[in-house]
Amino acid sequence: MADAGRSTRPHAVLFACGLNSVRSPMAAALFKHLFGRVSFVDSAGVRKGELDPFAVAAMEEIGLDIGKHRPITFEELEDLEGLNFDLVVTLAPEAHHRALDLTRRLPLDVEYWPTPDPTIAEGNREQRLDSYREVRDQLLTRIRRRFGAAPAVNE
């Protein structure tokens, strides 16, 4: 793992998971909140799912709104914007395999951050929401550890 800090912070990061409906939009929103003034971020999935209301609720608890996020696949993102990223952070095995396939034709780095799937949690609403909070908090910790402190306002 690279040392955290400005010198190792990529200019453009793509977070990817299976459906682009929970983990990758949460990670992208967290990254954007911390580094959006200095780095571009987006998210994609292997397939396109539906935005998960528990993910929206977990992010709202910390003041981040992902309610307008629209899940998108790698292919759709490439068709719309191109895949001009320095780094793809994959959060699920299928996304990791897809990102590694991209390295055959695109110059990008790929990091795999195994991240639990909170959608498989059982229990009442609060118990299920707790699993989304845990994923959110794990992603925030990992982003801070990997990319360093958020830049000062005057950077």
Residue ranges, per PLM feature:
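Short polar/charged helix/loop
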Residues: 1-155
